[in-house]
């Protein structure tokens, strides 16, 4: 069993996760989206790495219902093909939260006390407004162990 598979099994404590047999070398992490906390990401199988601009431009042709995460284009890492065959944008979760935190740190209203408060608020915003919302075509958010 490779290290990424072990990490994922430890993270979710769920032996029912179905890995693709013989594809351990292509396993690079998992994605989360509303209603599905663990979508395994396999390079060149269900993950197509693209630049942010290419991913956003091409997704409109592939899946007109696909949605973007406003203001976070720099965190797009490509497309994720879901089990139902639809394709959605895939964002790097850490990068997205870091962008949110940076925006909070630039806030001059006095709403945030310090860097830790900004980080906590960024994670809260992510869980409530990104991961916690459902609409058709919502993006997925990747936790990558290897690129």
Regions found by a protein language model. Give the residues of each.
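Short, Lys/Arg-enriched, disordered terminal segments
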Residues: 1-2
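C-terminal alpha-helical interaction appendages
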Residues: 6-147
């Amino acid at each position: 069993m490779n290290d990424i598979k072990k990490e994922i099994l430890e993270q979710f404590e769920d032996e029912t996760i179905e890995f693709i047999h013989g594809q351990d070398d292509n396993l690079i992490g998992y994605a989360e989206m509303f209603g599905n906390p663990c979508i395994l990401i396999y390079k060149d199988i269900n993950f197509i790495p693209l630049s942010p601009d290419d991913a956003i431009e091409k997704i409109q042709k592939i899946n007109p219902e696909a949605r973007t995460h406003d203001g976070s284009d720099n965190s797009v890492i490509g497309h994720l093909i879901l089990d139902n065959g639809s394709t959605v944008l895939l964002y790097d979760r850490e990068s997205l939260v870091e962008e949110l935190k940076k925006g909070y740190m630039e806030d001059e209203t006095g709403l945030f006390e310090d860097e830790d408060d900004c980080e906590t608020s960024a994670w809260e915003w992510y869980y409530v407004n990104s991961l916690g919302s459902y609409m058709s075509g919502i993006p997925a958010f990747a936790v990558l162990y290897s690129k």
